[in-house]
Amino acid sequence: WYAPIPAGYNIIGFDMVIVNRMCKEYGPVDKKTGLQALFSKVYKIDVMDNIFMWTENDPDIKSISMDSMREVMGLSSDNAHDALQDVKDTANILIKLMKTYRAVSTKIKLEKAFSNGDLYV
């Protein structure tokens, strides 16, 4: 059995904290670690981290909040901050990021991503 990979917007700083607390109280808990046993403990997809990487050098992006990303990506703000709508919007943002990545990654290669071709350490 492979544990599901959790995905969310600011999942590491918010959602997983709550998941861990609720699992400690109600279960399931990993007997060895005492941590939640619902999701993968290794892999997580924090959409906000991905947004930061894609937008850090864009002067037009003033904030990476969910509200700002809804506006930037043309998503409706109707029902914003409703839990289910936030999940749907997060999924749509992740899908847009993945499609953008796929489109870009077919045109460039990592070894040519640096200005002079050298890798920095």
Predicted regions and their residues:
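Metal-dependent phosphoesterase core characteristic of DEDDh/y 3'-5' exonuclease domains
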Residues: 1-121
